[in-house]
Each structure stands twice: as C-alpha cells, then as structure tokens.
C-alpha cells in the first residue's frame, strides 16, 4: 500500500488524515508543516512516522525543500499527497508536473485551484453557474468603496481575496453593520494597497451556515458529508467550533451539479448560507477542510476514501459510506479561545 504525505498549514485536519488511514493500514505517514506556527509536534506512537516544519516564502523555495526531502526518502510506490492549506495547494499547482510524477494527488486541477483560491476570480466564475451567491464586489479603488456604500444593502462582509492578503489584513471575515464602520475598515485596508472582497451579508445565525465536504472521483462518483456550522468562533467569522451532520437532498443536488459542471476531481469543501429556503454559495476550498474529522464521525471518512481510490480499491460507495446524521464535531482549540463576539 502507498505511504501518505500531508503538506500542512494546521495540525487538526492533518493529524486526522494520518490517523484515519493509519488505523486501517500499516503504512508510513509524513506531515510537512508549511509556514506554520506549530513549533513542535509530538505525535502518538505509530500514527505519524515523521514531521518537519518548513518556512518557505515562495513556491520556488518550497519546491527546493521538497525536492531535497523526497530524494532522501525511499518509497516503494508513489505516496498519496494531501494538502491542508490554501498555500500548499497553490505551491503544488505551480510545480504540478513534478508532483504528478512523484505523488498521487488528491487536489483538483490547476484551473480550479487558481480560481477558487482567489475570491475575486471565484466570484466571476460563480456568476457563470446556476448557484445563488450574495452580491459581491472586489474593492480595488476608492470608487469601489463608494459603489458599495450606494448600491449594497447593509450589513456587509469584508474578507481578504486570498491567503496572502489574509495574513496582511489579519482576519478571515469581518462584518460591518454600518456604512461608517465599513468606510473606516475599507479605507484603512486600501491605504495599505491591499485589495479585498465585499459581500452583502446574508441574514441568519450560525445555524444557517452549511458545510458540504466531499471527495469526487474521476468517474464522477461523489462521497459527501454535509451539515450545519451550529457554532462559529468568533461568531460569524467562518471558523466552525461546533458542527452537526444533517443531510439535505436539495443542497446535495445543488453541490453535485456544480462540481460536475466544473469537472472537479479530488477532495474539497463548500460553504453555503441558507436564507428563505435557498442556499447561497459563500466559498469553496480545494482541500480537506479543517473540520474534516466530522466525516469520520459521520462514517463517511473522506480522506480514507480518497486513499482507497488512489490505491484503486473497489468500493460500493452507495452501501459502504452512508452519512449518519446528528453526529457532532467540536473543535476544542476554538472553543477555548476567549475573544469578544459580535452580538
């Protein structure tokens, strides 16, 4: 069986992937932390073979490091590669030909990675589909700021365009209740020559935020897991502190149709907001979500299923992997954070 390599930005999903697969197969598992704030990770015996922590300011530096690392390891078969951060997806995409020679990939093709890891590009792409989406504008100039003030319904959400801008701005999502709040935030960000995205806020609490995580095979077969982000921390900021599985056939059909249309093959996740019975596309990840563990809890273990597929194992997914509803996931690392939340 093939070994597993995870290029990680955070611990939770990366360790979950290794644990899920290592519990079934006596293989070697490797975690490469990329530009992570994790200084040292002591893993339970037998679950993770090796961990390294790299700082790489560019894709070229990353490629030099992993090329050297790969040459020092002997793999009997091509290892299966998982990326658990936007940055690792983008870095791998830049050297995809080399990675396809050295690994079995679980990420989608480069066009999907490049579009959906940039919220400005993804907004343009979504408008060409049948998906509903909140009114959105990429803010590049003072005129764009004024356009939002005149044409958008408040409150609005501002968010960075990609992972690089998120580091500069310092937040994933910020809700602006008033025009004055929006103006203050927007002019402050734009003064630093940082472009960002503005969206109309879709009404509804955390329990109206839905997740749809999936693995789509090359033949079009999809195994999925869906449910509600019943608690976000901080509130309304997108980070799921607690979730519950809950199948919704309408949402499943919407998601599956969309993934088929764009030709998605690999692991990923989509966030939706429910309002008045409709589902609005918020964003998509081209990698396992940080809460991928919930798929194990729901008995649809997506990383393991991707591993089965990489090893060409025959699966009857309709019988083997049926989501169990009302299964709860709790991210204790978020629950224990103390930070003021939006009322």
Predicted regions and their residues:
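ATP-binding N-terminal substructure of ATP-dependent carboxylate-amine bond-forming enzymes
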Residues: 1-108, 143
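Glycine-rich phosphate/pyrophosphate-binding beta-alpha loops
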Residues: 232, 240-242, 285-299
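Active-site nucleotide/adenylate-binding loops and adjacent lid/helix of ATP-dependent enzymes
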Residues: 115-197, 206, 218-219, 249
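Conserved metal-phosphate-binding beta-hairpin within the catalytic cores
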Residues: 260-293
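Internal hydrophobic alpha-helix adjacent to the cofactor/substrate pocket in enzyme cavities
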Residues: 303-315
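Residue-level detector of conserved catalytic or cofactor/ligand-binding positions
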Residues: 333-343
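Phosphate-binding site of ATP-dependent enzymes
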Residues: 179-235, 246-256, 273-280
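Flexible, glycine/charged-enriched surface loops at secondary-structure junctions
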Residues: 265-270, 316-322
């Amino acid at each position: 069986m093939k070994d597993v390599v995870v290029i990680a930005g955070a611990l939770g999903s990366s360790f979950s992937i290794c644990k899920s697969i290592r519990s079934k197969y006596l293989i070697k598992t490797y975690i490469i932390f990329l530009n992570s704030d994790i200084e040292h990770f002591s893993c339970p015996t037998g679950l993770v073979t090796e961990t390294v922590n790299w700082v790489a300011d560019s894709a070229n530096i990353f490629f030099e490091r992993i090329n050297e690392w790969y040459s020092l390891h002997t793999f009997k078969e091509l290892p299966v590669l998982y990326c658990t951060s936007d940055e690792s997806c983008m870095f791998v995409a830049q050297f995809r030909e080399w990675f396809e020679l050295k690994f079995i990939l679980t990420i989608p093709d480069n066009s999907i990675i490049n579009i959906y890891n940039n919220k400005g590009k993804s907004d343009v792409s979504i408008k060409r589909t049948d998906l509903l989406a909140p009114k959105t504008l990429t803010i590049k100039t003072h005129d764009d700021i004024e356009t939002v003030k005149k044409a958008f319904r408040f409150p609005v959400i501002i968010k960075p365009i990609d992972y690089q801008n998120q580091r500069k701005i310092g937040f994933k999502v910020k809700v602006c209740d008033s025009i004055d709040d929006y103006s203050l935030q927007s002019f402050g960000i734009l003064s630093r020559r940082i472009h960002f995205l503005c969206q109309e806020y879709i009404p509804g609490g955390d329990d109206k935020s839905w997740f749809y995580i999936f693995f789509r095979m090359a033949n079009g077969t999809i195994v999925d897991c869906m449910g509600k982000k019943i608690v976000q921390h901080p509130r309304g900021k997108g980070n799921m502190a607690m979730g519950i599985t809950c199948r919704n056939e309408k949402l499943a059909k919407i998601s599956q149709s969309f993934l088929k249309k764009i030709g998605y093959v690999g692991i990923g996740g989509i966030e939706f907001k429910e309002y008045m019975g409709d589902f609005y596309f918020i964003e998509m990840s081209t990698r396992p979500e940080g809460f991928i563990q919930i798929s194990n809890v729901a008995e649809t273990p997506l990383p393991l299923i991707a591993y089965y597929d990489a090893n060409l194992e025959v699966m009857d997914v309709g019988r083997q992997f049926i989501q169990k509803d009302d299964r709860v996931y709790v991210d204790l690392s978020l629950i224990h954070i103390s930070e003021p939340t939006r009322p």
